[in-house]
Each structure stands twice: as structure tokens, then as C-alpha cells.
């Protein structure tokens, strides 16, 4: 991910939304560097449930390493981040959801894409909401 291209895209933006795959740690570093260079402080970063070993009955799996490593880079930054750790995606209609904080057991398993989208918009448009937090989200 080219930092200069990110800087151009971030010009004049208040919020940066990142939902990535691939070399997530490198991409997270590029995002943090670009945000420092250009000025936006607010980052909404999509990760995955289980990155802290917080899913009851599930062992941590190495497939989550890119999500955990990129979240650690974001958490070490001085940005006003929110890391969102969704459950498995469904195409169900929007509905009520449960949030869990880092260090709490993850509740539920699935999250509808409509519900997740609504939460992301709420976070992006509500100053201070879940700033410097990592939240798990699943349908009730």
C-alpha cells in the first residue's frame, strides 16, 4: 500500500475507514504513517473476532496473526482509533447487537452486514464514540 497515494486520498478527510486483507501489518503501518503526515486522527479499523483469544471454547489460531498484528500496530499509535472485531458475516436484516470490550469474552458468533454497517456509520459520525477501544460485535 503506497503511503503517498494514501496521503492524497486522506487530504481533507475527518475519518479513515480501513477494512483490509493481505499484508495487514504493512498496510496498517502505511495507514498510520499517512494519517500522521496528512492530519486525520480518527481511524475505524476492521479486524476479526478471536484476535485476543477471547472467543469462549475456541483456541487462538495462527490464521488470525495478520489481524492481531495489525491491531497491535494501531493500538500502539497515537490515533483516535476504534478497532471493530466482528463475528462471522450474515446477510440477515439489521437488528440488535452485542458489544464486548477487549479482555471480555466474545458474545455471540454472527453479525449481519447491515447491522455492522450501521454501527460503523454511528462510530464515524459520533465524535468520541469508542475512541481508543477495540470492540467485538455480534448479533444478539
Predicted segments — roles?
Residues 3-7, 13, 23, 36-42, ...:
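Oxidoreductase cofactor-interface core, primarily capturing Rossmann-like NAD(P)-dependent enzymes
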Residues 16:
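Receiver (REC) domain switch-region micro-motif
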Residues 20:
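Glycine-rich, N-terminal phosphate-binding loop of Rossmann-like dinucleotide-binding domains
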Residues 25-27:
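Glycine-rich anion/phosphate-binding loops
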Residues 30-34:
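A short acidic, amphipathic alpha-helical/loop segment
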Amino acid at each position: 500500500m503506497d503511503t503517498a497515494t494514501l496521503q492524497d486520498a486522506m487530504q481533507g478527510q475527518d475519518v479513515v475507514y480501513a477494512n483490509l486483507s493481505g499484508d495487514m501489518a504493512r498496510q496498517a503501518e502505511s495507514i498510520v504513517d499517512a494519517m500522521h503526515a496528512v492530519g486525520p486522527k480518527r481511524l475505524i479499523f476492521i479486524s476479526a473476532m478471536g484476535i485476543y483469544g477471547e472467543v469462549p471454547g475456541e483456541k487462538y489460531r495462527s490464521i488470525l496473526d495478520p489481524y492481531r498484528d495489525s491491531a497491535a500496530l494501531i493500538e500502539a499509535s497515537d490515533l483516535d482509533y476504534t478497532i471493530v472485531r466482528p463475528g462471522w458475516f450474515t446477510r440477515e436484516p439489521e437488528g440488535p447487537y452485542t458489544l464486548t470490550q477487549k479482555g471480555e469474552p466474545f458474545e455471540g458468533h454472527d453479525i449481519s452486514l447491515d447491522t455492522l454497517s450501521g454501527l460503523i456509520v454511528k462510530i464515524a459520525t459520533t465524535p468520541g464514540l469508542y475512541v481508543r477501544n477495540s470492540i467485538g460485535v455480534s448479533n444478539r
